Design a protein with these regions (language model features):
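Acidic/polar helix N-cap motif
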Residues: 94-97, 101-102, 119
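Conserved N-terminal segment of class I S-adenosyl-L-methionine
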Residues: 1-97, 107, 111, 124, ...
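A generic structural signal for secondary-structure junctions
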Residues: 14-15, 87, 103, 151-157
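A structural micro-motif
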Residues: 67, 88, 135, 182-183
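Residues lining the SAM
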Residues: 111-114, 140
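S-adenosyl-L-methionine-dependent methyltransferase catalytic module, highlighting the catalytic core
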Residues: 19-26, 36, 57, 81, ...
Length: 230
């Protein structure tokens, strides 16, 4: 595949993207973002950016909570699906160059988008730029320690996704947040093993014991909550 075809891979599968996503992963990420990271943050009336909106589940969840949502992705078909689902405002843009004014969002949500960008640290800086002072960035992304396993699964055609994937390491993600001027409030792991194994019930027992402990950096995915300081 060419670099461009990898960049726009998810745009090419926009009509079937949701059916290819794993339900257990989607459920857990929605919980992580809304029930955990934003549990103490009322969204009613808040301006929220869903960066890497995909087919719109996170946009819809934010709208349901009363937020004024902008759904952003790199492809027009993805944005169209997200806005149709959520009733949100759509923007087509690269996360590394948003084209939005500084300080215009109270909350920025980005779930499993960062790894698909050409420059993850640059994308974090852009997400931070459009945050208001005291605004929150809530981000989930795969952990780099699992990159080799995922690439092997892709080569063996065990997973349906062929887009650009550059996983970010635990420490690198914290450094990217710091370089963007953000204060990291929470950084934890989720999915103790690949969700494709179908051991969701067992994962829910094991995960709380590992998510914020010394082994958190070994988990499949990671979540960050960061604030833009005054």
């Amino acid at each position: 595949m060419t670099s461009r075809s990898r960049e726009f891979f998810y745009e090419g599968i926009a009509d079937r993207f949701e059916g290819l996503d794993h339900p257990a992963d989607v459920r857990r990420r929605l919980e992580v973002v809304f029930a955990e990271c934003l549990a103490q943050t009322p969204l009613a009336g808040q301006r929220v950016l869903d960066a890497g909106c995909g087919y719109g589940l996170f946009s819809a969840a934010a709208v349901e909570r009363g937020a004024k949502v902008v759904s952003l992705d790199i492809g027009t078909r993805l944005v169209a699906r997200a806005t149709a689902r959520a009733g949100s405002h759509g923007v087509v843009a690269d996360a590394c160059q948003l084209g939005l004014r500084d300080g215009c969002f109270d909350v920025v949500i980005s779930s499993e988008m960062l790894e698909h960008t050409a420059a993850p640290a640059g994308a974090v800086a852009e997400l931070a730029r459009v945050l208001k002072v005291d605004g929150l960035l809530v981000l989930t992304t795969p952990n780099r320690v699992w990159q080799g396993t995922v690439r092997a699964a892709s080569r063996l055609r065990l997973r349906p996704f062929r887009g650009r994937e550059s996983f970010v390491g635990w420490g690198r993600l914290e450094r990217a947040c710091a370089a963007a001027g953000l204060d990291v409030l929470a950084h934890f792991g989720f999915h103790p093993w690949p969700f494709q194994l179908g051991l969701e019930r067992a994962a829910r027992v094991v995960e709380p014991r590992l998510a914020r402990g010394p082994a958190a950096w070994l988990m499949v995915n990671q979540a960050v909550v960061a604030r833009k300081p005054r």
